[in-house]
From Swiss-Prot:
Positions of disulphide bridges: C26-C61, C35-C57, C39-C50, C43-C83, C63-C77
Source organism (scientific name): Bombus ignitus (Bumblebee)
Leader sequence segment: 1-21
Compartments it resides in: Secreted
Limits of the TIL domain: 26-83
Protein name listed in UniProt: Venom metalloprotease inhibitor
Superkingdom of the organism of origin: Eukaryota
Physiological role: Inhibits metalloprotease (human MMP3), trypsin, chymotrypsin, plasmin and microbial serine protease (proteinase K). Exhibits antifibrinolytic activity by binding plasmin and inhibiting it. Does not inhibit elastase, thrombin or microbial serine protease (subtilisin A).
Tissue specificity field: Expressed by the venom gland.
């Protein structure tokens, strides 16, 4: 029985070490594969610290330096200057909707 358990354990170790996940392919514009934070840099979270503390970094596709994801963690990487202009455009639309609502139009 002991011999069977040892053989099973060794087989499990060999299986686990040979079936590790392959490297992700990051082929979208301004994106690269690296080991990084648990939080993606997004336009909505620029300048904020990631609230998740990792023991080890995460292997994933991240935006290159100077870029952030537009939308959620899977959005396209856009330049940080585009984040600010898109935020301004959205804020302006919301303000105009609020003004038209207040004026009864």
């Amino acid at each position: 029985m002991f011999r069977f358990v040892c053989v099973l354990f060794i087989a499990l170790v060999v299986f686990c070490t040979t079936t590790s996940a392959g490297e992700l392919v990051c082929n979208r514009p301004n994106e690269e594969y690296r080991c990084g934070s648990a939080c993606q840099t997004t336009c909505a979270t620029l300048g904020q610290r990631c609230p998740i503390m990792n023991i080890r970094c995460n292997d994933a596709c991240y935006c290159k330096e100077g870029y952030a994801r537009y939308g959620d963690d899977t959005g396209m990487c856009v330049s940080i200057s585009q984040c600010n202009s898109k935020r301004s455009a959205i804020a302006q639309i919301l303000r105009s909707k609020q003004l038209s609502k207040n004026s009864g139009v």
